[in-house]
Amino acid sequence: MSHRDHGADGWESADFPITCESCFGDNPYMRMTRADYDKECKICSRPFTAFRWRPGRNARFKKTEICQTCSKLKNVCQVCLLDLGFGLPVQVRDSALNINSHYSVPMSHVNREYFADEHDPKTRAGLDYESSFGKMQPNDTILKLQRRTPSYEKNRPKICSFYTIGQCKRGAECSFRHEMPETGELSHQNIRDRYYSVNDPVAMKLLRKAGEMGTLEPPEDESIKTLYVGGLNSRIFEQDIHDHFYAYGEMESIRVMAEDGKYDQSGSNQQQQGSIAHTGLISQQQNQHSQMQQYYMQPPPPNEYSHYPSMDTQRMGAAFSTQESDGSSTSENNRAYSSYSYPMPPHQPYPTPPPYIDIYIYI
């Protein structure tokens, strides 16, 4: 039987999956299994390397659903098929950024496989136009709807089917959720519909939410020229604010109002410094508090000779008996060597560390 070249057949091999932070989970000690050409991509129907892991202690096992070529074409996660940069469905992202990618990937079986084979080398080199989704600048709609923190709720176990009919006998030991399934449009979700951005119920809900959001309109009174910007920290300076709003017109003045950075004198030093750092007035790097660190702890100076008899190079090797005029034997010579003691050098005192100084920064 001749050897089969999987690369020539278009089969995909990878070392690590392309997933979002939510699908990876919050477990830093994660064990992942890899299976070469184990599953078929649900978009292009080509075999690819599948990965399987458990994102958390109380989470279900997750696995890759599509190949990396299809993932790079849309810049989506291989598991949940959400955008890697914004955490939104493909339909929401394309509608907000005015991207017409509905017909960019064919839907028929033969055309999908041919399209994937043609774009596979381009996506690996990063030359395809679809692979530049992550470089696009978000607009106001994206900034309002994007997911800023990872959501681990979708990693929960699936609903127990026996519990829904009242026949689950495991109780608290059941590895599935004891909840009733949701009804409505969100219960009908399809991987291909989400990838092709067609009839995605989650995307429809987010688009309706974006339409209901109010827009920031200028006031009718043109004498009002003051704009309040909140939620800033100490890392943003006046020049940064000026550079950001300069594209919208000239500014008369910028006034930064910082809160009083003096903390309460009660409590320990760590709590007092934490009260300042949590307000965002100063950065954590400027508020570091070292706990009794010994500086300039140098090792003792080296010695010119060995401290232990076993380190003597003259005694290495076998000892041979010699005939001497005084009639001494080998055992006597060995006893003479063993009776010799190597003096240990005196202990060198460590240099005195500098005095510890507490530095507090007030704003």
From Swiss-Prot:
Q: Which keywords accompany this UniProt record?
A: DNA-binding, Metal-binding, RNA-binding, Zinc, Zinc-finger
Q: Which InterPro entries match?
A: Cwc2/Slt11 (IPR039171), Nucleotide-bd_a/b_plait_sf (IPR012677), RBD_domain_sf (IPR035979), RRM_dom (IPR000504), STL11/RBM22-like_N (IPR048995), Znf_CCCH (IPR000571), Znf_CCCH_sf (IPR036855)
Report the transmembrane regions from the record: none
Q: List all Low complexity biased stretches.
A: 283-297
Q: What is this protein called?
A: Zinc finger CCCH domain-containing protein 53
Q: Which residues form a coiled coil?
A: none
The record's region (Disordered) falls at 281-348
Q: Which GO terms describe its molecular function?
A: RNA binding; transcription cis-regulatory region binding; zinc ion binding
Bias (Polar residues): 320-336
The RRM domain sits at 225-310
Q: Which domain of life is it from?
A: Eukaryota
The record places its C3H1-type zinc fingers at: 154-181
